[in-house]
Amino acid sequence: MKKREPTVIFMEILAVLFESPRGPTRLAQACNVNYGRIENFLRPLEERGLIRREAAGGQEVFAITDSGYRLYQDWLGVWSRLPLG
């Protein structure tokens, strides 16, 4: 499997959280990131205010913030302009 750039993984996390908040296990699965490494990606996003931790039903979940949503939308705009395919 080809190694993905960290930027792509960060954006995949935002894309998944755009759909709905997720716990770390489901988030790691959805983004195809090893559970042991997911925190390495979540921490910088949280420190920059792009995601937040919440408690939901006694479980820790992550949700996208307004800033994270804006960044994700900007990224989609750039991505759509690239000559891919």
Residue spans of the language-model regions?
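Short alpha-helical segments that sit at the start of domains
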Residues: M1-E12
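Short capping segments at the starts of secondary-structure elements
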Residues: F18-G23
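A short acidic, leucine-rich amphipathic alpha-helix
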Residues: R26-A30
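Short amphipathic alpha-helical interaction segments
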Residues: V33-E47
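A short, conserved structural fragment
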Residues: E46-A56
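Basic, amphipathic "hinge/linker" alpha-helix immediately C-terminal to the N-terminal HTH DNA-binding motif
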Residues: G57-W75
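Amphipathic alpha-helical dimerization/coiled-coil segments
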Residues: Q73-G85
